[in-house]
C-alpha cells in the first residue's frame, strides 16, 4: 500500500517507524528524503569491494569494530540527552558505516555517530552526499567520511578535526592506496576498486 506523506512536514523517528511500506527513506532534520530504489552495477561493486576489505581486515585482526551496509538506520539526536524516538529528527542509511563502540548499537541500528561512513556517489545522490550528508556527518561527529565516485574513479576522504570540522579533504585517484584511518593498517587500492 502506497503511503501518502507530506514532504513539507517535519517528522520524527517515531513517525518513521510507523511507515509500513517498502520505500527507502531518510529523515534530514525531520524532512523526508526519498532514496534511489537500487544502485547501479558500479555502485554495487564498489560497495562490495570496500565492505569486504574492511570486514576481512577486522576479522584477521580480531577487531571490535563492525561494518554495516544500507539499509541500516543511523540516528543522529540533536542533543545527546534527547534520544527518545519522538525527539530524533535525522535518520540516514549510509552505504557503509563502521561502528567501533558497541554501546551505540541496538536492535534498530546505530544511535549516534558511526566512526566511519562511506557514501558511493550516483548521479541522483551527488549533491545530497556532498552537501546535506556531509553536514550531517560533520555535525554528528563522524570521524572519517569517504565519498566514492565510481564514475570519476576517485575517493574524497574527510577527517574530522579537533575543532569539530572536517579538513579540506584529500582526493585519491589513479593507482594509489587510500588509508582507512578508522582501521589502522588497512588501505584500499583505487586501482583494484575501480578495475573494470
Which role does the model predict for each range below?
Residues 1-196:
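Gly/Pro/Ser/Thr-rich low-complexity, intrinsically disordered segments predominantly at protein N-termini
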Amino acid at each position: 500500500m502506497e503511503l501518502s506523506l507530506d514532504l513539507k512536514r517535519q517528522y520524527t523517528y517515531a513517525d518513521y517507524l510507523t511507515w509500513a511500506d517498502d520505500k527507502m527513506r531518510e529523515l534530514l532534520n525531520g524532512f523526508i528524503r526519498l532514496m534511489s530504489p537500487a544502485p547501479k552495477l558500479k555502485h554495487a561493486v564498489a560497495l562490495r569491494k570496500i565492505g569486504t576489505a574492511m570486514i576481512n581486515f577486522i576479522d584477521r585482526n580480531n577487531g571490535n569494530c563492525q561494518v554495516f551496509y544500507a539499509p541500516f538506520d543511523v540516528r543522529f539526536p540533536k542533543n545527546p540527552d534527547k534520544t527518545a524516538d519522538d525527539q530524533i529528527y535525522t535518520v540516514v542509511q549510509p552505504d557503509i558505516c563502521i561502528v567501533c563502540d558497541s554501546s551505540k548499537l541496538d536492535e534498530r541500528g546505530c544511535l549516534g555517530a558511526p566512526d566511519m561512513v562511506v557514501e558511493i556517489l550516483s548521479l541522483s545522490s551527488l549533491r545530497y552526499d556532498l552537501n546535506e550528508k556531509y553536514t550531517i556527518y560533520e555535525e554528528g561527529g563522524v570521524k572519517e567520511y569517504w565519498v566514492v565516485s565510481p564514475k570519476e574513479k576517485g575517493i574524497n576522504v574527510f577527517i574530522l578535526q579537533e575543532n569539530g570540522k572536517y579538513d579540506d579533504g584529500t582526493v585519491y585517484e589513479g593507482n594509489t592506496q587510500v588509508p582507512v584511518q578508522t582501521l589502522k593498517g588497512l588501505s584500499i587500492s583505487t586501482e583494484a576498486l575501480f578495475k573494470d
